[in-house]
């Protein structure tokens, strides 16, 4: 198979697998928290990316946890993946897949940087998880922004340390010999 075709197929196969997985993890984070609080899950949709529930008892800790769990579960899974990453593996698919596996959840952290700024400007989307987290936790948007920046930087540092970025770049730049 032509190397360029292999790279493109790896990219599309990775996205085809990882976008639904990210949605499941994001909504799964909300779902797990709701279930822990005694809620009954009424809908869980991958297409449309949402879940709904009835009931449950949320408190000053669990309500902010519910709003942040959609970010935290995918990021936690990405961190575990990074820790188990094998940098010596030379498979083009593995390197592209691994890059995408950490890019999607790590990139979603940026919303938690942008939304607090919008929140301070009175422009945050009312339905956004980060805005709901700020409202329910009572934390300053600056604290949320700083936490998101630190989490984002930590993920980038670990991905760099594990050579995920370098191996992705090597796979993308590689040419048939």
Where are the model-predicted features located?
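Poly-acidic low-complexity segments
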Residues: 4-7, 50, 129
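Small-residue-rich helix-interface/hinge motifs
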Residues: 14-63
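Low-complexity, intrinsically disordered extramembrane tails and loops of integral membrane proteins
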Residues: 173-177
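Generic preference for well-ordered secondary structure
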Residues: 5-8, 12, 28, 90, ...
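Metalloprotease/metallohydrolase-associated module, dominated by Zn2+-dependent proteases
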Residues: 44, 52-172
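Active-site scaffold of zinc-dependent metalloenzymes
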Residues: 1-16, 35, 75-79
């Amino acid at each position: 198979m032509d190397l360029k075709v292999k790279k493109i197929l790896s990219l599309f196969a990775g996205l085809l697998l990882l976008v639904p997985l990210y949605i499941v993890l994001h909504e799964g984070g909300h779902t797990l928290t709701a279930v822990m609080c005694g809620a009954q899950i009424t809908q869980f949709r991958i297409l449309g990316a949402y879940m709904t529930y009835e009931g449950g008892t949320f408190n000053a800790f669990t309500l902010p946890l519910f709003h942040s769990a959609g970010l935290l579960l995918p990021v936690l899974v990405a961190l575990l993946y990074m820790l188990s990453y094998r940098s010596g593996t030379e498979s083009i698919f593995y390197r592209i897949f691994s890059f995408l596996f950490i890019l999607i959840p790590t990139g979603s952290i940026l919303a938690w940087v942008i939304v607090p700024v919008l929140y301070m400007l009175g422009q945050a989307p009312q339905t956004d998880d980060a805005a709901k987290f700020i409202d329910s936790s009572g934390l300053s948007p600056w604290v949320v922004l700083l936490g998101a920046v630190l989490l984002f930087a930590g993920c980038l540092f670990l991905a760099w340390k594990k050579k995920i970025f370098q191996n992705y770049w090597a796979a993308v730049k590689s040419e048939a010999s």
